[in-house]
């Protein structure tokens, strides 16, 4: 199950590319929108995300609904883009997720590197993959190397990628290449856990 980031809905190009790319590898992939994004879509008015407890509650409801429909031997992997992945990381252990995938984890708010969102990551028990751009303004490679993270967390760095994995032209890479590499990494990770 993939959750969107704070500003873009579940049908943003990023979310579509990852959901369809992972489905093409044989994985069953679902997406959902948090209530604030559903309201934004229905009314057309921009709304900020709800506070973390309400977002965690939404995740728990989605997980319960999915568990009611999946085979007993099915594995439940949760995650998402930026905020969606962060909130998934907050509920993964309590919800007994079989794995966690974070795409562009917001290690700190934009422009506030001193306000880290990493404390819970040190004790995370769910097998976790974080796919991150090396230039991500919410946690670049240099900054993240100094954080204490659980041994269950594996990081994969996308060369010259920003928060949405877009590289600079001078890097010689394209956004599509980084997305494709990210999809391949996620699929490989999920096949190993």
Locate each region found by the language model.
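Gly/Ala-rich beta-loop-alpha elbow adjacent to hydrolase catalytic centers
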Residues: 80-84, 88
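Short beta-strand/loop motif that positions the catalytic acidic residue
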Residues: 123-125, 130-132, 136
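Serine-hydrolase catalytic machinery in alpha/beta-hydrolase-like enzymes
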Residues: 2-74, 92, 162-175
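C-terminal catalytic histidine-bearing segment of alpha/beta-hydrolase fold enzymes
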Residues: 145, 149-193
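Active-site nucleophile loop of the alpha/beta-hydrolase fold
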Residues: 34-35, 102-110, 133
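Conserved alpha/beta-hydrolase "acid-adjacent" motif
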Residues: 137-143
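Hydrolases whose catalytic domains are alpha/beta-hydrolase-1, hotdog thioesterase
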Residues: 87-91, 111
